[in-house]
Amino acid sequence: MNLEEKKVFLKKNKKIKEFFIADDVKISSFRNEIMSMEHPIFSLKGGDTRIRIYEYGNVIIKIKPTADGIANIFDKDIWIYSISKLQSEINKNNSKISKAICFTPYDFFISTKRNKSGRSYEELRKALSRLKGTIIETNIFYSKNKKKSLSFGLIDSWKILEEKKGKLNIGMIEIILPEWLYVALKNKRILKISEDYFKIRKSIDRRIYEIARKHCGNQKFFKISTKKLYLKTGSTSLLKMFKHNLKRLVRKNNLPDYNIRYNLYKDIITFSKRF
């Protein structure tokens, strides 16, 4: 199906007139949403079906799972892919953007450095289902004089627009971004991340990179206690196991963009920018 055929197909099968074809746009740089980098709304392991409650300062987040578990940090790649494509379109054409995004699994797999096996197509379906079903309840959206509790999903909806030859040749997929994520993108509450993020295979390492990127920012370094880092990752492992994994990461020191050091005596982690 060529580009013009895709557009004709979508117009015939779309009730909402405005849509964005992600395949048409090359990602100039990858972007991540700030709130989800600051707080652990995505699970670090698959199949986590427990209701999770996270408290940090004045922030309370309750995460309710689907039958298949909470959306995990690898499911978040769909988010990152979507907002990166939209931001690239804004940068290039200063275009109005749509919450309705259409893409082929192939473009998603290539962009996020995934393999294109039959299993990958099935896992993409499951990831979309978890994103739709996971519910977040939080008071995070508040100002100094006003606090507001909200409940929302991680995507509003998804559907497969076309399918050929079973699982191995799925056609275009449509997702509708939630309003709050759409607003975050329009208000530039996003941060540029390394394209090597997708090469990070351990979920805990991905989460630690997010925290380093969010807090280090343009500073030369960022320090945090091990216990605070443990809390902010959303890890459900024992603290001693978290420290074991942390020491492994420190030895390898292979996070994109950042060096990581561990002061055992003070129990402090230091992230510093690579130059």
Curated annotation (Swiss-Prot):
PROSITE patterns: BRCT. One of its GO terms (biological process) is plasmid maintenance. Residues 98-198 form the BRCT domain. It holds the Pfam family RPA. Keywords: Plasmid, Plasmid copy control. This is Putative replication protein.
